[in-house]
A protein has these predicted regions:
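A short, N-terminal "cap"/entry segment at the start of jelly-roll beta-barrel domains
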Residues: 1-33, 48, 75, 95-153, ...
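Short acidic-glycine-tyrosine-enriched beta hairpin
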Residues: 58, 69-86, 192-209
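Glycine- and acidic-residue-biased ligand/ion/polar-headgroup-sensing regions
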Residues: 53-68, 174-187, 191
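Conserved hydrophobic/aromatic beta-strand scaffold that supports enzyme active sites
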Residues: 36-40, 58, 78-80, 100, ...
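A contiguous, mid-protein "functional segment" used to position or interact
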Residues: 202-253
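Conserved short histidine dyad/triad with adjacent acidic residue
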Residues: 20-25, 35-53, 144-145, 157-172, ...
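A short hydrophobic beta-strand segment most commonly corresponding to one strand
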Residues: 38, 80, 94-110, 158, ...
């Protein structure tokens, strides 16, 4: 069964000024594929960002700004953490919220993991190409691909559902994945049952679990979605339209993007 973690029900732990909510843990999802924390930092405070041996991860700024290992980060950035990374994230002059994700024993998900860059890699996702659904106004921006991160141990994207849009029902084979709701509200159809999701909620899907999303509100419903491992097969339910993505030729600010991504069907995105 899918797991839903409600952000407003998570019990934060105070640690040297920071408040940490453990959203996805082995106890919650029943395996150690992924760990996910939501961290709130008052202005000017800091928290440790460290990985255990064999672990890789990433950090995304949801609100505010900060500095990690000399790299300035804002809500435009996701930073990817190599093996053995240890550092401190220092919040800027405003209260800051981050997502901190970790993949233990990452080599089991990518036999070429040694080729992943050994230094910190940060991506300004607002410069990445915006893709639009072939069937409606949904938008997609890739956040983590082998071309961006240097590993296929995980894959990530941000998806926006404008009012009145919906995704066809499907499931995945070969990977598990989660959605963290960044903005708005939407409905997740999980094996035919409706579940309301709001900003701050996390949905974790295992393999072979049919799911779809609908936005029946008057505001955009936006979530980030990460797969572990990255490669997987997407299987569409009978009668569902394949979810294909078209290039728009612009980035999130309407400018020319830093690279080109062509038309492709979801799940058939190797080499991006």
């Amino acid at each position: 069964m899918p797991v839903i973690v409600r952000g407003d029900e998570a019990k934060p732990i105070s640690r040297i000024g920071a408040e940490i909510s453990h959203l996805l843990t082995a106890d919650v999802i029943g395996n150690d594929r992924i760990g996910l924390d939501h961290v709130t930092l008052p202005a000017g405070s800091s928290c440790d960002v460290a990985l255990a041996p064999g672990m890789i991860g990433w950090l995304q700024v949801l609100e505010g700004s900060g500095v990690l290992a000399g790299t300035g980060l804002t809500t435009k950035h996701i930073v990817y953490l190599p093996f053995g990374f240890s550092g401190s994230f220092a919040a800027g002059d405003a209260d800051t919220r981050i997502l901190f994700a970790r993949v233990p024993d990452a080599a089991r998900f990518d036999e070429a993991i040694a080729d992943m860059p050994g230094e910190l890699v940060h991506v300004d996702w607002t410069r990445e190409p915006v893709l639009q659904s072939e069937h409606d106004a949904r938008k997609r921006v890739y956040l983590a691909t082998p071309g961006l991160v240097g590993t296929s141990a995980f894959k990530g994207e941000m998806i926006s559902y404008p009012p009145g849009t919906a995704a066809p029902e499907h499931h995945h084979v070969g990977a598990e994945h989660f959605q963290y709701v960044v903005a708005g509200e939407g409905t997740a159809m999980l094996d035919g049952t409706a579940h309301r999701l709001r900003a701050g909620d996390v949905l974790y899907n295992y393999q072979h679990e049919p799911h779809a999303f609908i936005n029946e509100t008057d505001a955009d419903f936006v979530f980030v979605e990460f797969f572990v491992p990255g490669p997987c097969e997407t299987v569409w339910s009978p009668g569902a339209n394949l979810c294909a993505w078209l290039p728009t030729g612009v980035d999130s600010d309407g400018n020319e993007p830093v690279r080109d991504i062509g038309y492709h069907v979801h799940g058939q995105d190797g080499g991006i």
